[in-house]
Amino acid sequence: MTLTDAATSLHEQLVHEHSAHNYHPLPVVVAQGSGAWVTDVEGRHYLDCLAGYSALNFGHRHPDLVAAAHRQLERVTLTSRAFGNDQLGPFCAELAVLTGKQRVLPMNTGAEAVESGLKVARKWGYEVKGVPADRARIVVSAGGFHGRTISIVGFSTDPDARGGFGPFTPGFDVVPYGDLGALAAAIGPDTVAVLLEPVQGEAGVIVPPAGYLAGVRALCDDARVLFVADEVQSGLGRTGQVLATRGAGVDADVYLLGKALGGGIVPLSAVVADTDVLGVLRPGQHGSTFGGNPLACAVGRAVLELLADTGPHGMLAAGRRRGAVLQERLGRLVGHGVVAVRGVGLWAGVDVDPRLGSGRAVSEALARRGVLVKDTHGATIRFSPPLVVTEDEVAFAVDALEQVLDELR
């Protein structure tokens, strides 16, 4: 069957007429995906350098993950937590080992993991630290992105995410990201946690100053405050490490994981911490019908197996090698249509010279050349290809960006 642009128009019309208008996607309608590539309904091929905002760290339809899903689909997919299932225990144990923690609270989406982590932190504050009832406070960072639930957008500094959704949940203090002095000033006797991303993804891949995460750890230790690291985007290989926080030589008290944990196949997230933190939860105080379901846990176990390979041919090592190529190649463009490049591992934020056009315009031009990226905050675009991308494919993406910039100059 020969596909034409009419197929794209039809799909876009259906979405426009029947879906809420809460996204502004690029004019590409994907029909298939394999590895680092996708094919649209017209039959055109694209190198996926967004990877589902890092949900597809292992590429589209990784054979090990698809096989795990198929095996579980033939057995049982959902039990709820009213009963046990034979995938939940092994998944929690294996994730605890990989992260160096003792306990796991399985959920579904990244925002659920964040909300669950906030609840746990407050409860820990009341029951363990001894904060008076209803006075717990949590410090967060300006520019951070942790999801779009009502509590989370309440402490967002993004006017689009926040506007029109008040009144908001109280108990949050916002400080500049990377500013240890401001963080120290914000921590008081009722502070129970500091929540931050070790690398701010949605903000444009903002890497904190050297020593910042270690400084956060020290402040939390001094004040008996939980360090909660939102690794929903940064974790599970994106920075070349299992955990970006650990890559900086720091251990958080609580890790929030999601996106790639489900292999790009099923939603799966988790709160990971030691017993002295997650032990504050008792039956009936928190739950999720789908959290810890056998299908998600089976896929999650296959993801953990991929990450457990720390050898030179494993996913983490491959991501570091490809990431070094990406950072070096993008760095050459600074001063040639690019104002700045920030990044770590296989993850980069590129600030395009705003005189050449918006990040959206550059993203659309790249799509026409067969490369998918996404813009954020004006003239910034993000690169986060799957860890299975090759060096030649990385070069293809950066060459395409260079060609687009040349055309715009």
Predicted segment positions?
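Conserved N-terminal phosphate-binding loop of PLP-dependent enzymes in the Aspartate aminotransferase
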Residues: 2-409
